[in-house]
Amino acid sequence: MDSIGFTSKAVESVRQGQCAFCKFLSANDTGKTGGHQAGIYVPKNAVSLIFPTPFEKGANHDRWAEIRWMADTITKSRFIYYGRGTRNEYRITHCISNHFDPLDEEHTGALLVLVRREWEAYDGWVLNHEDEINDFLAMLDLDPAQVGGVIETSP
C-alpha cells in the first residue's frame, strides 16, 4: 500500500473508531536515547484511549489488547500504568512483531496514530513521511499543535 493509501486508511480508522490518539514518536519512545523506559509514552490527557479511568499512584496496573499495525500485522500489546515509586506514567509495550516494529529508531519523529475499535482491539499507524503527516492532519482538520492528545471527531 502506498503512503496515500496508508494515510487514507488511518483517517478512515480514526473516523470509525471509538477513540483515537496521535503523537509524534520521541527518541525516548523508540529507544534511540538508550533510556531504560520501554514502549510508547501515553500522556495523561489521553489515558481514556487505553484505560476506562485514570489510576492513582501507589500501584502498577496493566491490561492486554491486540493492535493491528498498518492494517496488517497484529501484536498482543500491554497497556501499563506505572504508579510505584517515583514513576507516574502510562505506556504501551510489547508492540513489536517480526514483520513490523513501530519503535524502530527510524520512526523517531513519525506520527503515531492509535485508534480504539473496542477495548480489546486497536488499529495502529505510523506515518513516517512529511507528506503523509500533513495529509493526515489536513484530512481531519487538525493543527500540528493538536498532536499529542485524543483526536476529537464529529459523528
List each model region and its residues.
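Intrinsically disordered, charged low-complexity linkers and terminal tails
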Residues: 1-155
